Amino acid sequence: MAEISESSIPRRTGNHHGNVWDDDLIHSLNSPYGAPAYYELLQKLIQEIKHLLLTEMEMDDGDHDLIKRLQIVDTLECLGIDRHFEHEIQTAALDYVYRWWNEKGIGEGSRDSFSKDLNATALGFRALRLHRYNVSSGVLKNFKDENGKFFCNFTGEEGRGDKQVRSMLSLLRASEISFPGEKVMEEAKAFTREYLNQVLAGHGDVTDVDQSLLREVKYALEFPWHCSVPRWEARSFLEIYGHNHSWLKSNINQKMLKLAKLDFNILQCKHHKEIQFITRWWRDSGISQLNFYRKRHVEYYSWVVMCIFEPEFSESRIAFAKTAILCTVLDDLYDTHATLHEIKIMTEGVRRWDLSLTDDLPDYIKIAFQFFFNTVNELIVEIVKRQGRDMTTIVKDCWKRYIESYLQEAEWIATGHIPTFNEYIKNGMASSGMCILNLNPLLLLDKLLPDNILEQIHSPSKILDLLELTGRIADDLKDFEDEKERGEMASSLQCYMKENPESTVENALNHIKGILNRSLEEFNWEFMKQDSVPMCCKKFTFNIGRGLQFIYKYRDGLYISDKEVKDQIFKILVHQVPMEE
C-alpha cells in the first residue's frame, strides 16, 4: 500500500522523526531460552536458593544476622527475582527484622536497645517501609550530630572507605521513599547526594573505594527511586554484581546471580513474542501507512515492559502498548494534523461514539478514527471477558475525557489564549493520557475489580491524580521549548510565568519541580499505605509513573528516540545476558 499524505490545507507540523526500528530486526528476534530445559533449570535454582536462604538466615542473633538478612532481600529485589521468594522474604527476613525494630531503629542485643549501625538501620527502614510495615523515619534522627550532619559511627580507619560509603548509599536509598512532611528524609537525601557526588568526583574524606560499590553509587545518583524502573534496574545490577569479585565469593550470591541472568533471558524470550505481535498488529492495521504519525510502537512496549515485566501480565502489556499507540495517533492528529473545525467534528464523534460523523473529513482522519474505534471496541471485548461484566461505559468515558482535553488545548492554541496555571494543570492532567493508559491494562490484570476497588484507583482517585500530575509535569519540564516552537504556547511553565511576571524561567522551573517532588512523596504514600486495593494494581500504576520519570529524565524518550533510547531498548529487549558455562 502506498503511504497516505495529508491534503493541501495549511497545517502545523510536529517535525517528528520517523520509525527508527526495522520490522525485520524485531521479527528476527529469536532466543533459545524458551526451551523447557531452561525453565527446569530455573526451577532447580529457585529451590537451591530457598534452601540456602534458610541456611544463611539460621545464624546467631545479632547485628550481623540482621544485616545479612536485609542484604539478601535487597539483592533479590535489585536483581528482579524477589517474586520467586516472597514467602521467604517475609517470614525469614522482614518479620524477623521487625521483631527487633523499635522507635530508635534496629535493636542491638535486645529489641529495646539501639544499634548505632547506620547501614543496618537504613537498610531495615527501607525494606520494611517498602513492604508496608509501620516504621517511622524518626529513626534516622539518631544518626545526626549537633551540626545536623549524618554520621556512620565508625572509628579510625574502619570508618574510611567502603563501610562509610555503603552506609551513606543505604541512607540515600532510604530517604527516597519519603512521605509528605518528613523533613529528616529531605535532609538525608540532600546530605547523602552531596556526599556521594563528592566520592564519585574523588574528593571528600574517603579513599580507595571498591569499584563495584562506586558503580552502585553512580546508579543510585543517576536513577533515583522514582526514575528507576524494575527491568532497567535488574539489567544494570546484573552487570554491577557480575563485576564484584569479592561479592561472588559467596555461594548463595553466585546462585542468585545465575538465577537472575537465566530469569532475565527466559522472560526476554516471552517479551520477544509480545513485541513481534505488536509489530504485526501495527503493520496490518493500515495506520502505519499514514506517514505523518509518530511510529513508536517499540518504544511504548519497551516502556511498559521495563515497568511490568512478569509473565502473567502479558495481556496488560499488549493493551498498554495498543492504548499508547492510539493516544499518539490522536495526539498527533489534534496537535498538528487537523484544523480546529475538524477537531470539533472528531470530538463530537467520540462524544456520541459515532464514527459516521467523520465521513466528510479527509481520508487520513477517517482511517485514523476507524483504527481508533476498532481498537477500542476490541479492547472492550477483552476487558468484559476478563472482568465478567459490562465495562463499556467506564472505558468510553475515559476516552471522552481525554479527547475533551485535547479540544480544549486546540481552542487555546487557535485563539492564542494562555490559561491560568490551575486551569492548565487540570486540563493537562487529563490530556496526559494516563487515565486510559492506566485503566485498560488494570482491567486486564488477573484480578476482578469491583466498583469499590475501581473507585480507589480510577478517576477520580488520589493515586490516579498523582500519576497524571507527575506525568504532566515531567513532560512539560522536558518539552516546553519544543512545544513553543510548534506554536503550543500553553505549558505549565508559561502559564505560571504569565501569573507571576516577575518570575524568571529558573524560578518558574524550580517552583514546578517543587510541585513535582511533593507530588512524588504523596505518590509514595498512596502506593505504600494499607488499603483494600490489590497490590498488583497499585504496583502497576506506581511503576508506570516511575517509567514516566525514567523516560523524561534526560529527554522526551517517546518523542525523540535517540541513540541512548535505542541502546536502552537493546539491553532490555534485544541482547541476551551472557551466561557463564
UniProtKB/Swiss-Prot annotation:
Additional remark text: In sesquiterpene synthases utilizing farnesyl diphosphate as substrate, magnesium is more efficient as cofactor than is manganese.
Q: Where is this motif: DDXXD motif?
A: 331-335
Q: Where does Mg(2+) 2 bind?
A: 331, 335
Cofactor binding remark: Binds 3 Mg(2+) ions per subunit.
Q: Name one GO cellular component term.
A: cytoplasm
- Name the UniProt key words of this record, in alphabetical order: Cytoplasm, Lyase, Magnesium, Metal-binding
Q: Which residues bind Mg(2+) 3?
A: 475, 483
> Which protein is depicted?
Delta-selinene synthase
Q: Name one GO biological process term.
A: diterpenoid biosynthetic process
| EC number assigned by the record | 4.2.3.71, 4.2.3.76
Q: What does this protein do?
A: Involved in defensive oleoresin formation in conifers in response to insect attack or other injury. Involved in 34 sesquiterpene (C15) olefins biosynthesis.
The written remark on domains in the entry is: The Asp-Asp-Xaa-Xaa-Asp/Glu (DDXXD/E) motif is important for the catalytic activity, presumably through binding to Mg(2+).
What does the record give as the reaction this protein catalyses? (2E,6E)-farnesyl diphosphate = (1E,4E)-germacrene B + diphosphate; (2E,6E)-farnesyl diphosphate = (+)-delta-selinene + diphosphate; (2E,6E)-farnesyl diphosphate = (+)-guaia-6,9-diene + diphosphate
The record's annotation in InterPro entries points to: Isoprenoid_synthase_dom_sf, Terpene_cyclase-like_1_C, Terpene_cyclase_plant_C1, Terpene_synth_N, Terpene_synth_N_sf, Terpene_synthase-like, Terpene_synthase_metal-bd, Terpenoid_cyclase/PrenylTrfase
Sample GO molecular function, one term: magnesium ion binding
The species is Abies grandis (Grand fir)
**Domain of life assignment:** Eukaryota
Pathway in which the depicted protein is active? Terpene metabolism; oleoresin biosynthesis
Cell compartments where the protein resides: Cytoplasm
Q: Induction of this protein: by what?
A: Constitutive expression.
Positions binding Mg(2+) 1 in this chain are: 331, 335
Concerning its family, UniProt says: Belongs to the terpene synthase family. Tpsd subfamily.
Coiled-coil spans are: none
